[in-house]
Amino acid sequence: MNETLSSSKPRWGEPFRAPGAKFDTCRMFENDFLEKYSRIHPATPFVVYVPLVLFMLWRSWTRHELAIASMAGLFACGVLAWTVTEYCLHRWVFHWVNETSWGKRVHFMLHGVHHDFPNDKDRLVMPLLTSVPFAVIFWTLFRVTLGTTLAEPMFAGMALGYLCYDGTHYAVHHFKQTSRIGRFLKRHHMLHHHADHDGGFGVSSPLWDIVFRTMPSIKKLAATQAKPRQAD
């Protein structure tokens, strides 16, 4: 698994720092194409999905002639649906670990890389190779169950919820938070990273951590800091 790729390439999973970069990263894929598209500029999701959100809201208003109240309600349901999805993916998919070698590698590619290299700017937001299939799945689900007229504003809300997640995730890692809400979300997420991997699964909102009683514990941080460092 950790075979040398070539004399000019870093070994799979091993830290390296690109020229001019401030933070370490690692190579995730031996295939150059997959490696390239496992990285993404943090603005890319907004460039792709903001026009989609606006287009679907425009269609809901002009073509389907939905009332403002109906559009707003469906849009809000879509945002709420994203918060549930965000929590469930983070808790039960991203933090699922199979002890086999392939299971560990899949976990590393899905989420472990972010915990090992939390400040890698190119791997903080979801790559299109992941977000587009998710978008297709949820759009199909909404359209089949609700019909196109109701699915469009709900999907627009879910897409906006996803953008809030990606934007919040990038911001708490790379920007100083001055607002009360921003400081809370940053602390919430940093506790998940550094103290309590079994809590703090919501990134854009703590709602479902409160509901499922998985708020990250400051006591675990104190316990971690109190442990004597083991000799190498």
Residue positions per predicted region:
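Non-catalytic, topology-defining segments of multipass membrane proteins
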Residues: 1-155, 198-232
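Alpha-helical transmembrane segments and their immediate juxtamembrane interface regions
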Residues: 148-183
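Short helix/loop segments within enzyme catalytic domains
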Residues: 177, 194-200
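Short, membrane-exposed interhelical loops at transmembrane-helix boundaries
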Residues: 185-191
